[in-house]
Design a protein with these regions (language model features):
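Residues on a specific face of well-ordered alpha-helices
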Residues: 76, 98, 176-179, 213, ...
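Structured secondary-structure scaffolds
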Residues: 20-62, 66-69, 121-124, 168, ...
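Cys/His-rich short segments
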Residues: 137-210
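Residue-level signal for inorganic ion chemistry
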Residues: 133, 178, 279
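Glycine-rich, flexible loop/turn motifs
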Residues: 28, 35-37, 110, 135, ...
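N-terminal Rossmann-like or analogous alpha/beta NTP/dinucleotide-binding catalytic cores
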Residues: 20-29, 34-142, 154, 166
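Intrinsic disorder/low-complexity segments
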Residues: 1-17
Length: 283
């Protein structure tokens, strides 16, 4: 990360003099773990510890730091987990959030806030964001074919659906992404789909309306922004972003037929929620 330009101040910590920058603020976060299981060393090493170390380093340099993280409470992992445990989704989320919070304290992580995404504040934020995007012509309604299980009597979204990855052939890929090769795709691209809830293979594609974020309409602006900002990032982050920029941005569905999540604030969509990847990054 490039050092910000600002007023330089020298401080001493344990007799060692450091040059710092008091005029800049640092917001530090990390990926939000799902509330569908215990936090473990994998979360600590791959997700939470790097951000915690950087937050501590910045504070030691006298920087103005806000370090936030929290639990990702929405999406199909939570819905599927609650059903498997025979619990209400809210009780299931509460159970694991409290366990996560205790683990964060036990690990002595220095978060200023370890929050959660199923809150009134989060709902208000997402509703405001959606309204702004809609007003700018970046939201479009489309009727698409989505997987429906006759056995479960419901549409299957994301992790409620399993099948063979269309990219690498992995046989236990999720409905929206493959955990083996990292590919993302639409549900109708999944090969030999089956329900993750009942295991039923009677999955058929039925029409349903969803709202799409029109990423294709902002790709030129995004590429221009990326060109000026990516050089400031780590080589890994820059390479990943530039890899995305080499392809066309794909318009993406941001609503789901699920009983849990941030409700969609648009007439006709009262029974749908926002896709977790539209909701959680703002948490």
């Amino acid at each position: 990360m490039r050092r910000p330009v600002g007023r330089r101040i020298f401080i001493k910590i344990n007799g060692v003099q450091f040059m710092t920058n008091k005029s800049n603020k640092y917001l530090i976060t990390s990926a939000l773990p799902y509330v569908n299981g215990e936090l473990h060393l994998g979360h600590l090493i791959g997700c939470l510890l790097p951000s915690d170390i950087y937050a501590r380093f910045c504070r030691a340099r006298g920087r103005d730091v806000l370090y936030v993280c929290g639990a990702d409470e929405h999406g199909t992992p939570v819905v599927v987990g609650a059903a498997a445990d025979g619990m209400s989704i809210q009780d299931y989320a509460n159970k694991w959030y409290e366990k996560h919070l205790r683990a964060v304290r036990d690990f002595n992580l220095s978060c200023d806030l370890y929050g959660r995404t199923h809150t009134e504040r989060q709902e208000k934020l997402i509703h405001e964001l959606f309204a702004r995007l809609d007003a700018q012509g970046l939201i479009e309604e489309r009727e698409t074919l989505q997987p429906y299980s006759a056995t479960d009597n419901m549409f299957l979204a994301d992790r409620q659906l399993l099948g063979t990855c269309p990219k690498c052939g992995y046989e236990n890929a999720r409905g929206d992404q493959c955990d083996k090769c990292g590919a993302t795709y639409e549900a109708d691209e999944l090969i030999n789909p089956r329900s993750a809830i009942s295991g039923a293979c009677d999955v058929e594609m039925r029409p349903t309306k969803n709202l799409f974020f029109m990423a294709s309409r902002v790709q030129d602006v995004w590429r221009k922004w990326l060109k000026s900002h990516a050089p400031k990032w780590s080589k890994t982050a820059s390479a990943i972003a530039n890899g995305w920029a080499s392809d066309e941005l794909r318009d993406t569905s941001i609503t789901r037929d699920l009983p849990w999540g941030i409700p969609v604030n648009k007439p006709g969509y009262e029974n749908k929620v926002f896709y977790v990847w539209f909701d959680a990054p703002w948490g």
